[in-house]
Amino acid sequence: MKPIQSIKAIQYRAYGAYAENRFVDLPAPVANDGQVLVRMRTVGINPLDNTFRSGHHYAATPENLPRVGGQMGAGVVVDTKSPSFKVGDRVFVTGPGFGVIADGTWRELVAAPAASLMPIPSHIDDDHAAAFLAGAGYLVGYLVLTEFVAFKPAQSVLAPGIGGAVGMESVQIARKLGASLAISTASTSAKAEKAHAGGYEHVIDLSRESLRDGVMRLTGGKGVDVIIDGVGGKLTGEALGCLLPGGTYAVVGYAGGREASVNLTDIIWKAAKVRGFTFRAFAPETLAAAQKTLIGYLSEGAIQPTIAKVFPLSDAADAVRHLIEERPFGRVLMRVED
């Protein structure tokens, strides 16, 4: 291909407000040995992108600036130095450290190791491919239920926050794996109604009843076997009280706050297993195998990403603000212009 001298990208050179996401020109990357050059089409936004850019991540140090944001996206191969892919292949792009300790996907061209790419099924468009990765909810839910828990069909799952990636997508994974109940929550009646209209039957409207009352109503007073909590904050203690004896509580995020008050007897008397979740705890082979399985689910229609809104890449600051402050129902994406 004809060499490209410069590309458009979203880069921040200081930690701080949304406006630090700047639309800039950068030198174009090239594919080195073992790498693949991908023209990005649609990229996703993860709450972690905001955590890092705002300076609230452990790796948000001066040494990690400047940084191109973005942890995932969908694109097409335009050059390759790897036998694994050929020019014209449509690919998912994601990898460890993207957008945090290495420049990410919010740019026109990305040179990535072949191991960071996966083929996109031909009938999945770029937006839904990016939405599948954005927020990593499918991967989180699948790993919790297959690696943290010896999950069995007919067990029950609670994943609070139906509009977010972890809540919505963990519910879909739980259904696929045969859960008897896959429960989530909504902070408003409008969001609960949207969830019900989208086929999510067991959503607790927290503006009308407490989490505990809702879980007990849906489970006949029993509680749930597994909790996948990406919300945290004040919801944590109440959710823990809904766990069945011997159940597993996976702490995977803190969209609702980093501090929580819990009744320790809910852990002690129930012999509860409380697990912290980080992708760093899994071997690369485990992550790759999980993604391959999930792409199969996506291809067969067993999981279906929901898109809330698509912005142009140049509006990254507004796009991130929309995700963090508006808390939309579904994934927020950015389309990369040619």
Feature-to-residue mapping (PLM):
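NAD(P)H cofactor-binding loop motif with strongest signal on the N-terminal glycine-rich segment
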Residues: 161-162, 231, 254
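NAD(P)H dinucleotide-binding glycine-rich loop of Rossmann-like/cofactor-binding domains
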Residues: 93-161
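C-terminal hydrophobic helical "lid"/dimerization subdomain
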Residues: 2-5, 285-338
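Short amphipathic alpha-helix with an adjacent loop that forms part of the alpha/beta core around
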Residues: 211-221
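Glycine-rich beta-strand-centered segment in the early N-terminal region that forms part
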Residues: 27-45, 57-98, 104
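Mid-domain Rossmann-like dinucleotide-binding core that forms the NAD(H)/NADP(H) cofactor-binding site
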Residues: 131-208
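Glycine-rich phosphate-binding loop and adjacent beta-alpha segment
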Residues: 179, 234-303, 335-338
